[in-house]
Curated annotation (Swiss-Prot):
Keywords tagged on the record: Cytoplasm, Cytoplasmic vesicle, Endoplasmic reticulum, ER-Golgi transport, Golgi apparatus, Membrane, Metal-binding, Protein transport, Transport, Zinc
Matching Pfam families: Gelsolin, Sec23_BS, Sec23_helical, Sec23_trunk, zf-Sec23_Sec24
Membrane topology: Peripheral membrane protein
The organism of origin for this protein: Yarrowia lipolytica (strain CLIB 122 / E 150)
Protein name per UniProt: Protein transport protein SEC24
Subunit architecture: The COPII coat is composed of at least 5 proteins: the SEC23/24 complex, the SEC13/31 complex, and the protein SAR1. Golgi apparatus membrane; Peripheral membrane protein; Cytoplasmic side.
Family of the protein in this entry: Belongs to the SEC23/SEC24 family. SEC24 subfamily.
Chief localisation class: cytoplasm
Amino acid sequence: MSQEHPEQGSSSKRRVYPQQQYDFAAAQPAGYSMPDPTQPYGASASPSAAMYGGAHAIPSPAAFQPHTANVQSGAFAPPPGTPGSAVDPPVAPGVAGGMAYGAPQAAGAAYGYQGLTNQMGNLNIGGGGAYQGGAPPGAAGGAHMAAPTQLNQIYNTDLLQNFPPPISDLTLPPPPVILPPGSSVTGNPDPNADSEFMRCTLNTVPTSSSLLKKSKLPFALVIRPYTALRDADENVPTVADTTIARCRRCRSYINPYVVFLEGGARWRCNMCNLTNDVPSGFDYDAVANKPRDRWSRAELNHSVVEFVAPAEYMVRPPQPLVYVFVLDVSVHSVKNGLLATAARTIKESLSRIPNVDNRTRVGFLAVDSSLHYFAIPRKEDVAEGEGEEGEENEWPEPRMMVVSDIDDPFLPMPTDLLVNLSQCKGGIEKLLDSLQSMFAHTVNPASALGSAVVAAHKLIANIGGKIVCLTSTLPNVGQGKLEVRDDKKALGTSREGQMLQTASTFYKSFAVECSKTQVTVDMFLFSSHYQDVASLSNLPRFSAGQTYFYPGWIASNPEDANKFALEFSEYLSQELATEAVLRVRSCDGIRMSAFYGNFFSRSSDLCSFSTFPRDQSYVIEVNIEETIVKPWVTFQAAILHSTASGERRIRVITRAFPTSALLQDIYASADQIAITTYLANKAVEKALQKGPQDARDLLMNRLNEMFTCYKKDLMTTNVGASAPLQFCTNLRMLPLLVNALIKHIGFRKTSQIPSDLRSAALCLLSTLPDKYLIQYIYPNFYNLIFMPDEAGLPDAETGQIVMPPCTNLSGEHLISHGLFLIDDGQVMFLWVGRDAQPALLQDVFGVSSITEVPTGKTELPVLDNQFNERIRNIISKAREKTDAITYQHLYVVREDGEPALRLWATTHLVEDRVEQSGVTYHQFLTSIREKLNS
C-alpha cells in the first residue's frame, strides 16, 4: 500500500480507536513527559542555567593561523586569488564561557582560560615568521598567537530530582573536542576523525598520571576501524600514489596536525616533534605528470584515510581469500536441519562471496566421528561436447574421502581439496546439493570438531584465510574433546565462574597457532543442548574471529531458518581485510597499556588479525607516564592489511584531544558511552577470570569511586545526608548504564541463565561496536500506540522510515491496553497488553480476541491497513543495518500469556527489579547516595 507523508501539523488518515486508549497525555504517569531529543546535555538541570550547548557565552572567534613555521619567501607561493582573510575557528556545540552551573566556586575565574594560558605558551603557532608559501585557501596571513581556547564547562545535575533519566542523552554525540584555533595545518574546520571510528573516554586529556588517578575516570580509546560491511557503504578517501610520509623516529603517519617548516621542505611530527623531510613525490602527481596542490592531499585534510602501500609494506604478495567450511554431519545436525540449511545458504551466497580478482578459494570438510574430505572437480575436468560448459549436470560427481584417524589428522590428497571459486562453481554447487542426501541416514552422534579444525588448518596454513565452523554437537571425540559440565546447581554461585572458563587448553593454544599462520576461526553454534560455548569461543577470541550462537535452533521453524540464512549470507558477503596488524601511537609520555577484543597480541603494542572483521570494535587502555606539556595530544591508529582485491593498504585514523591540568575540565569532557564500553570490557575480563559476582563488584566499585571523587573535589559545598545525588550532566546516563550492565544476562545474579547463554552474551559484550553495545545493555523501548503520526512512514526528504521516540525501560509504561516493542539489537519483543482493544488486534494481527494472538517466535501478518504497515515498517527499520549481520528474531508476548516468555521480556526493563537484582534504578541511585554520605 503506497503511503504519502502527511504535511507537518496534519494527521494522516488512520482508524479511530477509543480516545482514552490513544490519548498520549491520558496514559502517562503524573509528572512524566517524553524527553525531548533536541535538548542538549543538561537541559533539565535548570531552566535558567547555562546549558551544555548554550550559546550565550561562546568565546569570541580568533583568527586561524596556519600551523607552519620558518617561512622562506618565494617557496610554494599561493596561486593568485587565494583568500588571505582569517578563518573563524569552529565553535563546537557545548562551548560556554560562564561559570559552571551548580559549582560556582569550583569553576572560578581561572577555569578554562587562565588555566590554559601557560599551556598555550608551548604551542608553536606562527611565532618567528610562519611559513606562508602555499598556505591553504582561507589561511590567515599574519603571524600571531591565537587566544586561549575555552574548554567544555561542567554542569551539575541532581540524578534523583531529575528522574526518570532523559534517555535521549544516549543518542547524543560525545562532548565536543575543542582544539585551539590553528591546530589543523590546512584550516579544515573539522579535521578530527569521526567518533564512529575512534572515541576516547576523556575528550580532554589530563596532563599527569596523578590527575588521572585522582579523577577515578578510565582513560581508554574505543576503536572501530571499519564502519560498514562493504567498502561501498563507507566514504574513506584513498591516497593511491604510494607516497607515504612517516616520521623517522616514532613511525607515525603525516596527518592534519603536523607543522611544515623551512618553506615546506620539512615537517614536524605532532607525536614526537622530530623534523622530517617531505617526500619528493608529495607535491607531484605522477599519474598526471604535473605538480599537485599540496593542500588538497587527503591525508592533510582528513583524519581517516587509506594509503595504497608500496611493495616494502609486504612480507609476501597478498594472498587470495580462502574459506574452509567445516560442517557438522552428526545425527543431531542432520535432524535439526542445520546441514541442509547451511548447504543451501552457502550455494545461494556463492556469488556474494568477495571474488573481485577471481582468486578466492573454498574447501569443504564434514565431521562426525571421522573426517570427510571432498575433492571438487575443476572446470577443465568437464567433458567437452556434452552441452554448454558450466551446466550443473555436466560436472563430475565430487569425491568423498574419509579419514578415521582423528588424533593425528592428515590430508588424503594434495590437490582438489581447496579449489578456485570461479573455476569450480559448478562442482561446488553439485557438492552442496548432495550433502544432505549423503548423510541423511546417519545415526552417528559423535563430533570430532577439534580434529576437523586441525585438518582445515593444515589445508590452508600456507595461505591463510577463514575456517568457518557450523556445528550443533558438543565436540566429544578427538582433539579438544569436551564433556558436559552444565551444573545447574552451580548457577548463581561462586562456582559459576569456572563454567565460563575453557575446559580444555586446546582451544586457546590452537587459536594462537592459527593466528601465526594468518588463519581465523569463526564459530556458528546451534543447539538445544549444552555446547560449551565458553570453551569453543576461545578459538574465535584469539584468532580475530567471532562466535555466533543460535540457541534452540531448528530448521523446521521458518523464523529460525530465515534468521540464519539472512545472517550467514551477510556474513559471507562482507569484505575482508587479511594479514592485518593494528598499532596505536600517541605523543611522548603516553603509552597503550592494555588491549581488549578478539585478536592475537603479537607484542606489547601490536595486535594481529588474520582477517579483520567489519562488525567489531576494540578497546585500548591508555597510561600517562610523563607530564604532558602540549596543549593537545594526538592518537593515531594504523591498520596495515591486504584487501580482497589483492592490494596492500594502510588505514590511518587520527584524533586530537586538548589537555588540561584541571579536574573539572576532565569531567566536563568525559564520554559516558566510551566509559561504558570500557567498563563492559573490563567486566567481561573479570567474569572470565573470577566469575559474574566479581564483575558486578568491579562495575559498582568503579562507579562509586567516580561519585566519591566528584563529591569531594567538584561539588560546591559539603552537604548532609538529605542532599541530592549530584553528578556532571554529561555523565548522568553512566549510572543508568552501569545499573543495566549489572542486570544484563552476562553478569546478572541468577540461577536461571544457562552457562552457554551467559558465555555467548560475554562474547557480544566484548566485541559489539558502541552503538550496538549500548542498545544491547539498554534496549530501545517503543510505545507503538502513542507515537507521532509520521512514525512508521517514510520521511518526506530522506525517504527513510521515521522511528518513534524511545521511552524509559520501566514496567510503569506497560499499560494494559498498549502495544510495545523492546529491541536490544539481538532480539525483539512485541508486547501486547491484556486489555488491548479488538480494533487494535484486528489491525495488527488480523484477529479480534487477545487469546487468538499468536505468541512466541513469529512475524507479523501483512494486512491491508496503514497501522499494520507502520508497525511492520518500524520492525524492518530496526533490523536494517549496513555495518552488522544481525537480524533480530521477533517474539510476540501477551501480558496474560506464557510466564517464561513474559519473564524473559520483562528482564529487559532494567529500571525495574530484575530477578535477584532486587532494586529498581531509583533505589540503585539512593544506595549510592547513602554510601557517599555514610
